[in-house]
């Protein structure tokens, strides 16, 4: 599937600015550069900044869609991406994940204690970057700070909820509350920050935030589908990888509401993957998960239709929605 315009158009300026921000030297800078893919642990060149860069791309898109200039949005876009990466470093510690994008995680290379410091440092860099949006009026700059901090807090709340779901039969409502915060908060923040950079009023900013939160749910639920039924040749992970990690994702929450006895299987060691997959199929979880992601894509499309975006932006956003709901990785 072709990469949508929104994820192509802004990648180069975002990467260039990220590389400029990540010039910190010393042990802390070394960990930043390693995590972001700029260098390996031995100091040799890394694979480069990876990932979709969805959040910072949405900041830039949201600004331009309202007639704003990308230069006003870039510092905020980079700030949001750094917040996201602060959360990834800490999530890897909490989830005991040893690999990220095919490379050992920061805590596996540098130890848990130093990885915590690296995450904290990225958060500070993020806040510093958000102050570099010098073309914004003081009122809008303050609004951007409040928006970023509020979304970061809600994202952390979501991580707390995510950890609390482990080992118990949480249902769909609890899952959605968690995902709306853990994933939706930063994606909502992305569209709102872009609106701030373009000078949007509070009413419009609220609509942008709501759109992003719905988009975040669609993104996360599709991610959950891929984490269980994704093609290993595309994802680089085995079928059922999220199940093997004991992750309480949407498919599991949906299935548990229909087959509570599944909880006993989920607790077994060694993990009975084939039987769990069979139970998920029997509850209709696979189809329901795909349908739930499509539901939120339709809701996002409805909200976007009412926004005062330029015509090209509505086309580009529709392309992004199709990509997110059908993507395989």
Question: Across the structure, where does each feature detected by a protein language model lie?
Answer:
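Transmembrane helix-loop-helix
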Residues: 130-149, 259, 286
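C-terminal charged capping/lid subdomain of soluble metabolic enzymes
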Residues: 276-329
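Divalent-cation-assisted or electrostatically stabilized phosphate/pyrophosphate-binding catalytic cores
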Residues: 47, 100-123, 169-183, 206-210, ...
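Active-site alpha-helical segments that house and flank conserved acidic catalytic motifs
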Residues: 73-97, 149-154, 184-188, 192-195, ...
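Conserved N-terminal diphosphate/IPP-binding helix and adjacent helical/loop segment
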Residues: 1-83, 89, 93-108, 160-169, ...
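Short glycine/serine- and small hydrophobic-enriched flexible loop segments
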Residues: 60-64, 127-132, 192, 196, ...
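Residue-level signal for inorganic ion chemistry
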Residues: 58, 126, 158, 252, ...
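Mid-bilayer segments of alpha-helical transmembrane spans in multi-pass integral membrane proteins
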Residues: 113, 117, 151, 155-159
């Amino acid at each position: 599937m072709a990469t949508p315009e929104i994820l192509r158009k802004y990648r180069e300026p975002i990467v260039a600015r990220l590389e400029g921000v990540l010039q910190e030297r010393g042990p802390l800078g070394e960990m930043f550069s390693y995590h972001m893919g700029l260098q390996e642990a031995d100091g040799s060149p890394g694979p480069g900044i990876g990932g979709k860069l969805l959040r910072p791309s949405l900041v830039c898109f949201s600004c331009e869609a309202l007639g704003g200039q990308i230069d006003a949005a870039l510092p905020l876009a980079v700030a949001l991406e750094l917040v996201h990466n602060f959360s990834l470093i800490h999530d890897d510690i909490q989830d005991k994940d040893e690999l990220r994008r095919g490379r050992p995680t920061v805590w596996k290379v540098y130890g848990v204690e130093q990885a915590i410091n690296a995450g904290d440092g990225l958060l500070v860099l993020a806040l510093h970057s958000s102050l570099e949006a010098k073309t914004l009026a003081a009122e809008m700059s303050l609004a951007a700070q409040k928006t970023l901090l509020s979304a970061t807090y809600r994202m952390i709340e979501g991580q707390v909820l995510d950890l609390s779901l482990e080992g118990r039969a949480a249902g769909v409502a609890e899952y959605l509350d968690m995902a709306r915060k853990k994933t939706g908060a930063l994606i909502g923040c992305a569209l709102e920050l872009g609106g701030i950079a373009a000078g949007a009023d509070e009413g419009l900013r609220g609509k942008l935030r709501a759109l992003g939160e719905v988009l975040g749910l669609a993104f996360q639920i599709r991610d959950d589908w891929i984490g269980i039924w994704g093609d290993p040749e595309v994802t680089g992970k085995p079928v059922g990888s999220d199940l093997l990690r004991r992750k309480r994702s949407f498919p599991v929450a949906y299935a548990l509401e229909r087959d509570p006895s599944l909880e006993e299987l989920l607790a077994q060691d060694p993990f009975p993957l084939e039987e769990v997959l069979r139970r998920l199929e029997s509850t209709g979880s696979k189809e329901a998960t795909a349908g739930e992601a499509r539901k939120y894509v339709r809701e996002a499309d409805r909200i976007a239709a009412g926004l005062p975006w330029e015509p090209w932006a509505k086309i580009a956003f529709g392309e992004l929605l199709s990509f997110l709901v059908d993507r395989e990785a």
